[in-house]
Amino acid sequence: MTHQSHAYHMVKPSPWPLTGALSALLMTSGLAMWFHFYSTTLLTLGLLTNTLTMYQWWRDVMREGTYQGHHTPPVQKGLRYGMILFITSEVFFFAGFFWAFYHSSLAPTPQLGGHWPPTGITPLNPLEVPLLNTSVLLASGVSITWAHHSLMENNRNQMIQALLITILLGLYFTLLQASEYFESPFTISDGIYGSTFFVATGFHGLHVIIGSTFLTICLIRQLMFHFTSKHHFGFQAAAWYWHFVDVVWLFLYVSIYWWGS
């Protein structure tokens, strides 16, 4: 902030946007190689480059915000707007999956037997594992709110406990979802039902894994005394993201598991 007459963070030159773009090129090329030639070398290289880029870029962001004081109130306001826009883009991303599901289920074609679920498909019972998954995610929504309130009250120990509980519930949800996939009587290849089911719930599962990782980083940062009641946007963004994941699951449960079965 030296020799600066404004509160905005003037970011110094960084290699991470370039390495991030390179990793995106390697991953997309690697996916094509994997799909067509069954070679995972390029994809592995892309994933490794992407992981290293994310780690080092966010490490720099944490240093700038926590130790160098660059995340002033106007900068934090910009970060909040950025996170809100990101979550909005995710809402539209999932809207596409719901559109595909309702387009297929509200007016089933003769090829599907004229009804939904299509002929030959045995849907999962919504009152078994899906209902347990719903309970787990709702409980995690309560625990992340508990963590937030504990942070605002400067109760460090309760914040750590609540955050750890949230992460464990996220892990439990992921394991339940994986077991459900392995035991499912249909696959992603079973027509439009299998496609919409596995793509929608699979992308949600991916978001749960991302959110759990996000919260794990927040737990590590809390253990390192990075957060205060006045300065904790990293945790706030993770909590917003987790609540978004919760709400999307409720729509998935009601639409695909309950109504769709």
From Swiss-Prot:
Keywords: Membrane, Mitochondrion, Mitochondrion inner membrane, Translocase, Transmembrane, Transmembrane helix. GO terms for biological process: mitochondrial electron transport, cytochrome c to oxygen; respiratory chain complex IV assembly. SUPFAM superfamilies: Cytochrome c oxidase subunit III-like. The keyword Secreted does not apply. It is an enzyme of class 7 (translocase). Pfam families: COX3. One of its GO terms (cellular component) is mitochondrial inner membrane. The keyword Mitochondrion applies. Component of the cytochrome c oxidase, the last enzyme in the mitochondrial electron transport chain which drives oxidative phosphorylation. The respiratory chain contains 3 multisubunit complexes succinate dehydrogenase (complex II, CII), ubiquinol-cytochrome c oxidoreductase (cytochrome b-c1 complex, complex III, CIII) and cytochrome c oxidase (complex IV, CIV), that cooperate to transfer electrons derived from NADH and succinate to molecular oxygen, creating an electrochemical gradient over the inner membrane that drives transmembrane transport and the ATP synthase. Belongs to the cytochrome c oxidase subunit 3 family. This is Cytochrome c oxidase subunit 3. It comes from Pan troglodytes (Chimpanzee).
